[in-house]
Structures are given as C-alpha cells and as structure tokens.
Amino acid sequence: MRTSIHAQTIYVFAFLLGFCSIVYELLLGQSLSAFLGNTVLRFSVTIGLYMLSMGIGALLAEGRWLEHAAATLLKVEILLTVVGGFSVIFLLIMNSVGIPDTLFSVLAHLLIVLIGVLTGLEIPLLIELRGHEVEGCERTVLGVDYLGAFCGTIAFAFVFYPRFGLIPTTFFVGLLNAFVGVCLYTQRFKVHEAGRRNYAALVGVQAFFFVVLAVLVQTANRVNELFLRYSLAS
C-alpha cells in the first residue's frame, strides 16, 4: 500500500512540475514579446531554447546528481522557485532601469536556459526516486510530466494570462513550485545519514520561499499597481 501511495505521489509531483516549468517559459515569452515586440520570434526562440536546455539538463543528470536524488531534487526546486517565481519581476526591474534592449534580451534568455536546464534535471531525479526496477516507471513519469506541461499551456492561455496577468501568475506558479519542494520532505525519501542535516536546512529554505510567495500572491495586485505607476512615472 505504501509503495502504491509513494508511486502516485511521484506522478503528482511530475505533473505539477511539468505544469510549472512550461508556465514559467510562457511567462518569459510573453514578457519578451511585451517589452521587445515580435511575438512569433519571442515565443519560437523561447520554446526552442527551453527544449534544448531540457536536453542539456537531462544529460547532466548522472553520477553524483542521482546518488542523492532527494536532496538534489530539492535544490532544483528551490532554484526553480526563486528563478521562475521572480522572473517577471526581475525583467520588469531591468526594463524600468533602462538597460539596453540587447542586454535585456540576453538576461531574459539566460533565465529561459536556466529554467530549461533545471527542468531537464527533474525527470531523471523523479525516475530515480520512483525506482528503475519498477516496470514502466520511465514512460509513466515522462507521460505525466508532458500532460502537466500541456495543462500548463491551456491554463496560461485561457485562465492565468487573461484573468490575472503576468505578475500574479508568476507568484502563484512559484508558490506551487515551492509547495512541491516542501512536500518532498513529507515523503521521507531515503537520505544519506551525513546529508540529513543539510537536507533539513534545504527544506527550511524552501519553506521560507513558500511563505514569501504566499504573501506575494495575496498582495500581487498591489505589486502590479506599483510597477504600473512607476512605469508611467518614468
């Protein structure tokens, strides 16, 4: 029974992480389109870089990365929570201070690559936690992750962007990402004795960002108004 629950939890994680990652990329694509124009170019390059970076991340997932899969995945989720959850705010600040368009574009595309690489690491780590010996593990985790990504694109197009806008959506998806990170601790994955203290510290960091983003979600409209006022004033 425990094995079954554990398996279902891994699949839920895969779905949610696939959902979060694609929404991060769509947020960045839309932000680039809004700031620099040429929507087709921005989204094409964003998705292309995202897929390439995912492949790089998957290739990096070997050796010591997989040896301590639970701790490594938690580190990945912390990074994704921070990079993805604050990506739009970062771009808004960079645009507000008036940096050149070329530098702005480089910074935005670095975010795209970083999120893609981290996303590419997630699947091998989830498969490692699920266990290679389980028949059909790899294809099920992949399938559920892709389903999550599909649902993310639909949610972004029909719910998040038209109803809430970029900033509230970024905070919410970052919060969802942080929630998955915190939930990793509740599953009691096998952690090496020497790494337990470090693992507990990582959970604390993830919990901190969860609280921060929960507050930001509640105040997202106010934050949005502040940025609009600043943009109009400048």
What is each PLM-predicted segment?
Residues 1-234:
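Alpha-helical transmembrane segments of multi-pass membrane proteins
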